[in-house]
Amino acid sequence: MKQPCVYIVASRSRGTLYTGVTANLPRRAFEHREGLVNGFSKKYGCKVLVWYELHESMIEAITREKQIKAYSRAKKIALFAKTNPSWKDLSTDLYSVRKVRRYRTASA
């Protein structure tokens, strides 16, 4: 899944939030989960992918990231409150889709 996107990772349910941007969400989610990203997210243990939004270009994604970073905590939570109310780790879904795509490609 190489596509520009904005994402939010959390330290735990109702915990600290970090907003970021990447062109490779599965890789970046893995890096956060394993503590490979130095800085704020590592310091506060932000490892759970709770929200993401895909974009057509990196410029568009960076613009949106800046917009979201300026949001209050409540407004950030409102982005995913209806679609992910339990703050489930969405990265597991990314890896499942990736494995299915690999399998289909290999067997085709």
Name each region found by the language model.
Residues M1-N38, K42-V48, Y52-L54, I59-K66, ...:
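GIY-YIG nuclease catalytic motif and its immediate N-terminal context
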Residues K43, K66-L79:
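Short arginine-rich
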